[in-house]
A protein has these predicted regions:
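Redox- and metal-dependent alpha/beta enzyme cores, enriched for Fe-S-associated oxidoreductases
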Residues: 1-22, 35-42
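Flexible loop/turn segments at secondary-structure boundaries
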Residues: 6-9, 33-36, 58-60, 91-93
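Secondary-structure transition/capping motifs at alpha-helix termini
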Residues: 16-25, 76-80
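An N-terminal assembly and electron-transfer interface module characteristic of large anaerobic redox
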Residues: 30-39, 122-130
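A structural-propensity feature for long, helix-poor, extended segments
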Residues: 39-60
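Peripheral docking tails and interdomain loops at the edges
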Residues: 54-130
Length: 130
């Protein structure tokens, strides 16, 4: 799940993964308010794991703004799917296809192992910045 221009890059990654036979998808949110909670919960309810990409970090321990709303939408609509939040573009850094491919690799690992691990993650940090 993501918004804005990152969805275009993510769509390119999804297309490449699908060509390789990987079950991958993208839900691009076109508007944030009013938040389409019921529609999102229904669209995501069949997934085995999902990632929510946030452009901005949040000053809490629960995740970015989009992640919080997606999590709430799933909870209120009684849909349970393992979810992780990725904050990207820290410091104005570009988000690459390779970084987005790693998100899908992480999701495959979550599905295979059943272990969510750290639910709040960062994309594109330099080594030693995690």
């Amino acid at each position: 799940v993501c918004m804005n221009s990152t969805a275009g890059t993510t769509k390119a990654v999804v297309d490449k993964l699908r060509e390789k036979g990987v079950k991958a998808g993208l839900l691009k949110l076109r508007m944030f308010r009013p938040f389409p909670a019921e529609e999102i919960a229904e669209a995501l309810s069949h997934l085995k794991a999902l990632a929510v990409l946030d452009k901005a970090d949040s000053l809490n321990a629960a995740g970015g703004a989009l992640f919080e709303d997606v999590t709430s939408a799933m909870y209120v609509n009684k849909k349970q799917v393992p979810m992780v939040n990725y904050v990207y573009g820290i410091g104005g850094r570009d988000t690459t296809e390779k970084q987005l491919e790693s998100v899908y690799s992480d999701l495959a690992e979550i599905v295979q192992s059943g272990n969510l691990g750290e639910p709040y993650r960062y994309l594109g940090l330099r080594k030693g910045e995690n």
